[in-house]
Amino acid sequence: MGKCRHNGEVSIFGVRPASFPYFPFNLMDRIGGFVILDELWLRRWCEIIEYPMKIPTLYVPIEDYGIPTVEDMDLIVDFIKYHVSNGREVVVSCIGGHGRTGTVLAIWAGLNGVENPIEYVRECYCECAVETEEQEEFVMEYLKKRL
């Protein structure tokens, strides 16, 4: 299994996972957007954002250990697609960087042709990615509907 790398050092098809409070500020020249999945991160980001930077930010609150709605996942995917297709990367983060972030990463990997996206994300990013059975089922069902 892959070791946990929650500081934005890993890029999976243009998406960089991070966990609170890490943000890859050293890669600002590559970052086009930030997807925040937890209110604590949103509050912290609002404090940090006073730093002179402008990063388009999408806030989609997902309960800890939970899953997004299909509509919210579509919104996240569209946000990522837009920025990646324009040559920029997107940071995705919840708090621990495992379940909710892992779910988004696995779906993104699957949409990019990875055959076993959950295993791929666990190997490339973090062995704890996609924490719950509900999250695993959501990944597979979402990909069935969208591929």
Swiss-Prot record:
What Pfam families is this protein classified in? Tc-R-P
Alphabetic keyword roster: Plasmid
For molecular function, the Gene Ontology terms on record are:
protein tyrosine phosphatase activity
Q: Does the keyword rRNA-binding apply?
A: no
Taxonomically, the superkingdom here is Archaea
* A single GO cellular-component term on record: cytoplasm
Q: Which InterPro entries match?
A: Prot-tyrosine_phosphatase-like, PTP, Tyr_Pase_dom
SUPFAM superfamilies the UniProt entry points to: (Phosphotyrosine protein) phosphatases II
Q: Where is the signal peptide?
A: none
Q: What family does this belong to?
A: To M.jannaschii MJ0215.
Official protein name in the record: Uncharacterized protein MJECL20
Q: What is the originating organism of this protein? A: Methanocaldococcus jannaschii (strain ATCC 43067 / DSM 2661 / JAL-1 / JCM 10045 / NBRC 100440)
